[in-house]
Design a protein with these regions (language model features):
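PAPS-dependent sulfotransferase catalytic core
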Residues: 1-116, 121-122, 139, 143-145, ...
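Adenylate-forming
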Residues: 123-127
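ATP-dependent NMP and nucleoside kinases share a basic, alpha-helical "lid"
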Residues: 128-146
Length: 160
């Protein structure tokens, strides 16, 4: 299990990774997850800002998020491991209503140990409207951003 601070205080991510579909965000997320100074949530995509600013996402995101939690549970079972109690509590809290509030978003990164950089990898942030981009800038003024892009033709072919 990754480093985990069960007593951690709610905090904001220090790094945000966004990008187009098939641009490599999953690969980069998994690579950064291996770095001892980067902390990632047990699920890749947090979806906070698009839940708040993309009405077309709002209906599906609670289900999608709960499914990501079930996938995390399946990964533990597949490895023959029991999920630690503190992670179970965390996942229950993350899937309880109300979701996608500022408090909820900060709580998503609370288990990140001191000295690590919490990472939010949500490619869909690249589709935010102007109001969403403004909220990101206001809410995360010190965050560093990674925007992955890919040749559009190669990306389209990879989706076939």
């Amino acid at each position: 299990m990754r480093a985990w601070d069960a007593e951690g205080k709610p905090r904001k991510p220090r790094v945000v990774c966004i990008g187009a579909q098939k641009a490599g965000t999953s690969w980069l997320h998994h690579q950064l997850n291996e770095h001892p100074k980067i902390w990632t949530t047990p699920f890749k995509e947090v979806h906070y800002f698009n839940a708040r600013h993309c009405p077309e996402h709002q209906q599906l995101l609670p289900w999608h998020f709960r499914e990501a939690v079930r996938a995390t549970e399946r990964r533990f079972r597949a490895r023959g491991e029991e999920m630690p109690d503190e992670m179970v509590r965390y996942l229950v809290e993350m899937t309880a209503d109300p979701m996608f509030t500022p408090k909820w978003y900060r709580q998503a990164f609370a288990p990140a140990p001191r000295g690590t950089l919490p990472l939010d990898t949500t490619p869909e942030y690249s589709t935010l409207p102007d109001a969403g981009v403004d909220e990101v800038a206001d809410f995360l003024p010190r965050a560093k951003f990674i925007y992955l892009i890919r040749d559009p033709v190669a990306r389209a072919i990879s989706q076939l």
